[in-house]
């Protein structure tokens, strides 16, 4: 049984959305998930203020263009070797419509582009993807920085998962393992230690033996990370590498993803802060904003 029985792909015809189509098609095919597609059209309030023939024709033209865009997206999925179970045309605020449809369908994963039609800097995400990431009931994959021609874009690529011992991170590791097995990708596990958590703050007399204690903590952490990697290998993931880094979890994850040429970063929805929602400034939110490649944020309960 697939880890995601249903995948919802949100598209708007932009370059970022085309990247999302490539990824959603590949994942749903490899994981044997049902793929649903939604195109959200903008409302045109001024049309509702008039009821003459000219504005009625204008409204019909917009609807025809939106239906054409939806149809083109379906064709693109099929051309990429995928199959669309059902497609939907919604009208309204994009993020709300995507989140509501995901809930209605009971999907396990939403895939969408990072910035819609606007060209913006790498450190920013579009308002739609940000809102969906924060409010969706399910896991979300932001297709940022994806290059279909890259050697890392298609399997065997490299998947980096950030772990910290939380239940959410464990769920992210399980998803990583399943995707790696299905696609033949390498799996990389990273745990980031924050040195300041171990450094004494009560005066020079407390520093005696601190370095020795910190080295012991690093050895224990390295052993734990390798143990997690070994567990993933026992689940028949062919290639698994473990990494221990010093620094903030978000910065360390973003750096390592670029260093190894990861094609996907996976992490849990809470991170180290114990937050119930993904909030601005959290590990998950920061990685989703700054990573060079697609980022999947996994909710603990998967469908």
Walk through the language-model features, giving the residues of each.
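Residues at the starts of beta-strands that form the adenosine-phosphate
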Residues: 6, 32-36, 84, 157-158, ...
């Amino acid at each position: 049984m697939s880890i995601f029985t249903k995948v919802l792909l949100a598209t708007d015809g932009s370059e970022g959305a085309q990247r999302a189509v490539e990824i959603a098609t590949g994942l749903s095919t490899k994981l044997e998930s049902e793929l649903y597609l939604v195109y959200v059209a903008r409302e045109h309030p001024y049309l509702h203020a008039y009821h003459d023939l000219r504005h009625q024709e204008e409204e019909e033209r917009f609807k025809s263009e939106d239906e054409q865009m939806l149809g083109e997206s379906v064709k693109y999925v099929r051309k990429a070797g995928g199959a669309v179970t059902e497609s939907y045309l919604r009208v309204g605020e994009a993020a709300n419509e995507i989140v509501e449809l995901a809930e209605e369908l009971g999907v396990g994963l939403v895939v969408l582009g990072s910035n819609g039609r606007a060209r913006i800097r790498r450190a920013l995400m579009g308002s739609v993807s940000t809102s969906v990431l924060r409010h969706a009931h399910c896991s979300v994959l932001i297709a940022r920085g994806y290059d279909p021609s890259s050697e890392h874009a298609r399997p065997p690529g490299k998947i980096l998962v950030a772990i910290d011992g939380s239940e959410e991170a464990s769920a992210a590791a399980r998803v990583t393992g399943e995707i790696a097995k299905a696609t033949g990708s390498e799996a990389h596990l990273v745990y980031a230690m924050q040195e300041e958590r171990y450094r004494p703050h009560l005066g020079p007399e407390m520093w005696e033996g601190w370095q020795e204690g910190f080295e012991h903590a690093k050895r224990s952490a390295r052993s734990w990370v390798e143990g997690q990697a070994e567990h993933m290998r026992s689940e028949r993931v062919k290639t698994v590498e473990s990494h221990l880094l010093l620094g903030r979890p978000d910065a360390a994850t973003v750096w390592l993803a670029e260093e190894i040429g990861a094609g996907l970063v996976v992490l849990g929805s809470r991170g180290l802060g114990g937050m119930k929602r993904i909030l601005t400034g959290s590990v998950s939110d920061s990685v989703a904003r700054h990573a060079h490649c697609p980022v999947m944020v996994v909710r603990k309960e998967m469908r």
